UniProtKB/Swiss-Prot annotation:
It is an enzyme of class 2 (transferase). Its main location: cytoplasm. It is found in: Cytoplasm. It catalyses: guanosine(527) in 16S rRNA + S-adenosyl-L-methionine = N(7)-methylguanosine(527) in 16S rRNA + S-adenosyl-L-homocysteine. This is Ribosomal RNA small subunit methyltransferase G. S-adenosyl-L-methionine binds at residues 73, 78, 124-125, 139. InterPro entries: rRNA_ssu_MeTfrase_G, SAM-dependent_MTases_sf. It comes from Citrobacter koseri (strain ATCC BAA-895 / CDC 4225-83 / SGSC4696).
Length: 207
């Protein structure tokens, strides 16, 4: 599996240390093992997880600005755990409302010795925003409108929302609330992944 990960990283133009690669592999191993009992993801094949979960998460890393991030609706830690491995200088709060997912995240934190994540069980609209975050990240979480409605209290003054999407959600972008605007749309390339991937970066409008 390490050889496959190395090939995928080369194709994506991403350079990681051997330690980071081993951490990503260990995370996939844990996800595969726990998935049998906890049903954390519909992806069953570890090699497929490398593409659809690991690479699909870390290709957004170069586009994140800041040091403090919150991954809302993180599920089994996607994209937060892969991002925390490739960006050890940043801190990621991993938020999910389901206890079984948060238990898995805490076990990953323990076994991989990840000191830059904080797993939290909470509904996003009930989670306090102090201190505010530099970035709010979502992957397969909700529509842009719902994401902004539920998470608008989380970013700081210069914070951003980062929504990982498949096809470009043109209708969702067109119907953004007036208090927000799209800063950029990045077309992401994920090796061996079928279909399009886009990162929509949204900023609150200054009043």
């Amino acid at each position: 599996m390490l050889n496959k990960l190395s090939r995928l990283l080369d194709e994506a133009g991403i350079s990681l240390t051997d330690h980071q690669k081993n951490q990503l592999i260990a995370y996939v191993d844990m996800l595969h093992k726990w998935n049998k009992a906890y049903n954390l993801t519909s992806v069953r094949d570890p090699n497929e997880m490398l593409v659809r979960h690991i690479l699909d998460s870390i290709v957004m890393a170069p586009h994140l600005q800041g040091e403090r991030f919150i991954d809302v609706g993180t599920g089994p830690g996607l994209p937060g755990i892969p991002l925390s491995i490739v960006r050890p200088e940043s801190h990621f709060t991993l938020l999910d409302s389901l206890g079984k997912r948060v238990r898995f995240l805490r076990q990953v934190q323990h076994e991989l010795k990840l000191e830059n994540i904080t797993p939290v069980q909470s509904r996003v609209e009930e989670f306090p925003s102090e201190p505010p975050f530099d970035g709010v990240i979502s992957r397969a979480f909700a529509s842009l409108d719902d994401m902004l409605s539920w998470c608008r209290h989380l970013p700081g003054e210069n914070g951003r929302f980062y929504a990982l999407k498949g096809q470009l959600p043109e209708e969702e972008i067109a119907s953004l609330p007036a208090a927000f605007s799209v800063e950029s749309v990045v077309k992401l390339r994920v090796p061996q992944l079928e279909g399009e991937r886009h990162l929509v970066v949204i900023k609150p409008n200054k009043i």
